[in-house]
UniProtKB/Swiss-Prot annotation:
The protein, known as: Small ribosomal subunit protein uS9
Pfam assignment, any one: Ribosomal_S9
Gene name for this UniProt entry: rpsI
Gene Ontology molecular function, alphabetical: RNA binding; structural constituent of ribosome
SUPFAM superfamilies per UniProt: Ribosomal protein S5 domain 2-like
Protein's organism: Mycoplasma pneumoniae (strain ATCC 29342 / M129 / Subtype 1)
Ranges in coiled-coil conformation: none
Length: 132
């Protein structure tokens, strides 16, 4: 018996995305927080970034994708969704790992905002130094 749905959790910056892939016979649609991606995200580049693993593997039409994403901004959310899609695709077919790993899509991007330190204006910006 074949699995009904595949799950992947993706994180990027302060965003977290739960991705559910459901096999379908239709053209395959994507919903992000119960909305269409073009309605949810402000620009097309973010949507292309999110759909990159599906374009690489030519599986865009094979799945209905339902995403629940929280936290962060649009770029972080798109990165979290992308990693979630990759992890769910690997559950579906582990042989896709070679293609996805060659484009560095299987690893989490661990870069996060550096914290502000006391005595400074930001993470690194220091007050102006006066010699005399």
């Amino acid at each position: 018996m074949e699995k009904q749905s595949y799950y992947g959790l993706g994180r990027r910056k302060s965003s977290s995305a739960k991705v559910y892939l459901t096999p379908t016979q239709d053209k395959g649609k994507i919903t992000v927080n119960r909305r269409d991606p073009s309605e949810y995200f402000p620009n097309k580049l973010v949507i292309q970034d999110m759909e990159q693993p599906l374009d690489l593997t030519d599986l865009k039409k094979n799945f209905d994708i339902n995403v629940v994403v929280k936290g962060g901004g649009f770029t972080g959310q798109a990165g979290a969704i992308r990693l979630g899609i990759v992890r769910a695709l690997l559950q579906f077919n582990p042989e896709l790992k070679k293609i996805l790993k060659s484009k560095k899509l299987t690893t989490r991007d661990k870069r996060v905002k550096e914290r502000k330190k006391f005595g400074l204006y930001g993470a690194r910006r220091a007050p102006q130094f006066t010699k005399r």
